[in-house]
């Protein structure tokens, strides 16, 4: 355990930041999983709705500074490509 006041503060800050990051990572994983499941089930309306939610959530994480703009664009692009595949089929 830390002895200095500043070191104790840093430990608390790190714990808080770690918890927040874990929440955001899980959120991204869950929303992308929802799109994947809808696409695998070939449910067009569910896939479109899940994609709409995923797009909004991912871009909100960009505005919070959790992920970079290019990373969000790549994730959204891949999800959109999957949704378009079942649209064409």
From Swiss-Prot:
The residues that cross the membrane are none
Sorted alphabetically, which keywords does the UniProt record give? Ribonucleoprotein, Ribosomal protein, RNA-binding, rRNA-binding
- Pfam families recorded: Ribosomal_S20p (PF01649)
Protein name per Swiss-Prot or TrEMBL: Small ribosomal subunit protein bS20
* Species in which this protein is naturally found: Sulfurovum sp. (strain NBC37-1)
Q: Which GO terms describe its biological process?
A: translation
Q: Which Gene3D superfamilies match?
A: Ribosomal protein S20 (1.20.58.110)
Similarity annotation: Belongs to the bacterial ribosomal protein bS20 family.
Which cellular component terms (GO) are annotated to the entry?
cytosol; small ribosomal subunit
């Amino acid at each position: 355990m830390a002895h200095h006041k500043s070191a104790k503060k840093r430990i608390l800050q790190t714990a808080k930041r770690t918890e927040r990051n874990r929440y955001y990572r899980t959120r991204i994983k869950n929303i992308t999983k929802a799109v994947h499941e809808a696409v695998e089930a070939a449910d067009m309306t569910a896939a479109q709705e899940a994609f709409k939610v995923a797009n909004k959530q991912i871009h909100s994480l960009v505005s919070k500074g959790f992920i970079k703009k290019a990373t969000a664009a790549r994730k959204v692009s891949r999800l959109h490509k999957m949704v378009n595949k079942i649209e064409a089929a």
